[in-house]
Amino acid sequence: MIELQGLSQRFPGGSGEVHALRDVSLSIGAGEVFGIIGRSGAGKSTLVRAINLLNRPTSGRVIVGGQDLTALDNGALRLARRDIGMIFQHFNLLSSRTVFDNVALPLELAGKTKSEIEATVLPLLDLVGLSVLKDRYPSQISGGQKQRVGIARALASKPKVLLSDEATSALDPETTRSILDLLKQINRELGLTIVMITHQMEVIKQVCDRVAVLEAGRVVEEGRVIDVFLRPQHEVTRAMIGDVIAQELPESVLKRVESRLGNGRDHVYRLAFTGEGVDQPVLAQAIRRYGLDFNILHGHIDEIQGQAFGSLAIMATGELADVKAAMEYLQQQGVVVEEIEHVV
């Protein structure tokens, strides 16, 4: 559905050119919810604005629905953009227009008749849960409701792609969850391809199928969300996952562990389970099979896209050969095993 091929974006700066994007290539499938995450200044917003050519890339190609947007003239590009809706952190509603009229605005600009507008807007307001508020003004509704208006307005032209640029970052956690649930519903019911730009790994965890991690304008990691959580490869990814799932041992645990390491019999590991592995007694089986003692130091169970995800930090006590064999056994059972060589 969306192909980004070798995108680079350079801007003039006070001390030379600023490289906002560096050779970014991504493939996003039709009907997919794809997340793009990174820290501030990583190039996320520049990238999402390149998808609909609000920012024309310095080099590279943007292909949406088989059409190379970078090759279009201005008139053809305006038509192509009708297939791409966009929502923002700031709602950008017109204060003098009602909820209904804000959603209707792009249809009015497209020259639709009053009956055509009504036939489109009313079902959209029902979809986003705002039918009873259609005659209210932006000053009379909440932030979450304003974002729902923004979503309905973005859907008014019946796009095939919805771009979300930090759309929940100004909302409280409860409202954020409700907006993410709405986006999942829209994806499910309309088959819409959604690209989520965010700095919050919690958003990625809740709604996305796949994710790309940006750092300094480059894609440093990409994959299914569950796989990225299980096996983060880049330090930026590990740090951002740590914001939602504790990766470090608590200080009180570190003090107890430190005194026992180095004796040759105690080894600390981080174990990650997913799916059916969360429900299986694999630790008990390893203890019985290899005659070891396992001390659980820290644990966490969560859910990613409806799939159970568990993380444990354990201290395994026993002969080194037996400990290694037990870890290999756990890996054979689908457990991701990482030895924590330095805990302090």
Curated annotation (Swiss-Prot):
Enzyme Commission number(s) of this protein: 7.4.2.11
Reactions the enzyme catalyzes: L-methionine(out) + ATP + H2O = L-methionine(in) + ADP + phosphate + H(+); D-methionine(out) + ATP + H2O = D-methionine(in) + ADP + phosphate + H(+)
Localisation per UniProt entry: Cell inner membrane
Domain ABC transporter, residue spans: 2-241
SMART domains found in the cross-reference section: AAA (SM00382), NIL (SM00930)
Protein topology in the membrane: Peripheral membrane protein
Record keyword Transport present: yes
Keyword entries, A-Z: Amino-acid transport, ATP-binding, Cell inner membrane, Cell membrane, Membrane, Nucleotide-binding, Translocase, Transport
The organism's place on the tree of life at top rank: Bacteria
Alphabetized InterPro entries for the sequence: AAA+_ATPase, ABC_transporter-like_ATP-bd, ABC_transporter-like_CS, ACT-like_dom_sf, MetN_ABC, MetN_ABC_transporter-like, NIL_domain, P-loop_NTPase
Gene Ontology molecular function terms on file: ABC-type D-methionine transporter activity; ATP binding; ATP hydrolysis activity
Alphabetized Gene3D superfamilies for the sequence: 3.30.70.260, P-loop containing nucleotide triphosphate hydrolases (3.40.50.300)
Protein name: Methionine import ATP-binding protein MetN
